């Protein structure tokens, strides 16, 4: 059974890595892999509790998926109402080096609240308006991708992996920001400083200045600003909600989406002269959410959960403990692998291999110094968050932003 499950996972992940050559969406492969792994585990595992384990794992995975669906809807709603124009339209500098620094810093902080792919798309759209040279665009785009990945690494809502670690209780929002903000910022400053050497200290000459994006029909600046404030405020509300109530973050995100949904419905109900077809209601925006990505996360996370239920991840963790026994090396290898392999299954696998160590387990451990790294907010979780996030910048295929 173990060999069969390993072969299914390796073959499935190989197909995911080659999705562009195979011309098969990775979500379809992930769902098939998930179904195959759980079927093999059920038929050959001889475990009467397999149904219960499946429900428990699906519950944990669904929390992450509901969080992502709500967050993606909020971001899409802001974008549909031109909310991000408030940020991009205030960039007035034309000096290329100043523009590079400005774009990298804005991207860094935006991706801490939004997901890194959305942030990258917004900044690349702005870049195309301001920089005409193809080679210079590549340099600017590379810095933007690095800044987006680094910005998502220090925020509990900035990347799927940080969301996973935060929601499962591996890290807390306050210490995550406190420990990783400076390392993440340095990981942006150094590449930007190097890239500046390849950018001439001169003003940009955009080819088309009339291509600046305009607000959607019947959406005024005031309405656009309100949607932006409510949306971003709702995203920032989630960590506060979890800290105050102790309830799961996905519930706070659902509340934020509900508030924004009610607000936009009330506004559109008062726009009697506006055609229904051009109203960006949430029910319409939901049709444009990237559901294949959500289904990919469902398939890949449940596939890793199957390996965990089979005991494979625990066995691999024991192997690393005996032969490596060094959290810096394990996290570093994970970071390097994230340049080639999607960081979501990598982080999910590490979470399955190393459960959060509580006080009782730490006290009874034969090596409490080593196990201290795996407590909540332990050094391993912060290293894993940073390495998996920033490591995706090493290659263009290493992250969704790239």
Model-based region annotation:
Residues 1-3, 89-95, 215-227, 373-374:
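Short, amphipathic, aromatic/basic-enriched membrane-interface segments that mark the entry/exit
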Residues 81, 103, 234, 238-376:
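Transmembrane helical segments that form the transport core of multi-pass membrane transport proteins
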Residues 6, 31-32, 65, 100-105, ...:
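Hydrophobic alpha-helical transmembrane segments
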Residues 81-92, 205-212:
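Flexible loop linkers connecting adjacent transmembrane helices
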Residues 13-17, 35-39, 108-109, 193, ...:
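Alpha-helical transmembrane segments of multipass membrane proteins
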Residues 176-264:
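Core mid-bundle transmembrane helix pairs that form the ion/substrate translocation pathway
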Residues 5-77, 86-94, 250-302, 312-324:
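Hydrophobic transmembrane alpha-helices of multi-pass solute/ion transporters
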Residues 37-47, 58-59, 110-147, 151, ...:
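Membrane-interfacial helix-loop connectors
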């Amino acid at each position: 059974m173990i060999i069969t499950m390993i072969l299914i996972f390796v073959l499935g992940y190989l197909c995911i890595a080659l999705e562009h050559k195979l011309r098969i969406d990775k979500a379809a492969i992930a769902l098939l892999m998930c179904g195959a792994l759980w079927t093999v585990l059920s038929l050959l595992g001889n475990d009467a509790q397999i149904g219960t384990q499946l429900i428990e794992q699906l519950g944990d995975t669904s929390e992450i998926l509901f969080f992502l669906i709500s967050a993606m809807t909020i971001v899409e709603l802001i974008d549909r109402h031109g909310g991000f124009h408030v940020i991009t339209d205030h960039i007035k500098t034309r000096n290329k080096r100043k523009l590079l620094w400005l774009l990298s810093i804005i991207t860094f902080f935006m991706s801490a609240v939004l997901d890194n792919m959305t942030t990258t798309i917004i900044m690349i759209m702005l870049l195309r308006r301001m920089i005409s040279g193809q080679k210079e665009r590549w340099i600017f785009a590379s810095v933007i991708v690095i800044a987006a990945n680094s910005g998502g690494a220090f925020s509990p809502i900035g990347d799927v992996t940080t969301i996973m670690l935060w929601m499962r209780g591996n890290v807390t929002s306050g210490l995550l920001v406190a420990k990783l903000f400076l390392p993440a910022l340095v990981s942006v400053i150094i590449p930007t400083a190097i890239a500046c050497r390849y950018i001439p200290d001169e003003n940009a000459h955009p080819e088309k200045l009339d291509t600046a994006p305009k607000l959607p029909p019947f959406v005024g600046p005031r309405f656009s600003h309100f949607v932006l404030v409510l949306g971003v405020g709702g995203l920032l509300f989630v960590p506060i909600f979890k800290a105050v109530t102790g309830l799961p973050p996905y519930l706070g995100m659902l509340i934020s989406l509900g508030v924004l949904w009610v607000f936009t419905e009330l506004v559109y109900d008062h726009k009697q002269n506006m055609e229904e077809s051009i109203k960006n209601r949430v029910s319409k925006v939901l049709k444009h959410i990237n559901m294949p990505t959500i289904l990919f996360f469902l398939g890949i996370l449940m596939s890793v959960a199957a390996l965990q239920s089979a005991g494979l991840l625990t066995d691999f963790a024991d192997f690393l403990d005996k032969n490596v026994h060094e959290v810096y090396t394990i996290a570093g290898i994970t970071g390097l692998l994230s340049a080639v392999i999607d960081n979501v299954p990598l982080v999910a696998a590490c979470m399955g291999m190393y459960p959060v160590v509580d006080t009782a387990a730490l006290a009874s451990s034969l090596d409490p110094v080593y196990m201290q790294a795996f407590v909540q907010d332990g050094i391993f979780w912060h290293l894993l968050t940073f390495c998996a996030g920033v490591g995706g910048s090493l290659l263009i295929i290493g992250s969704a932003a790239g």
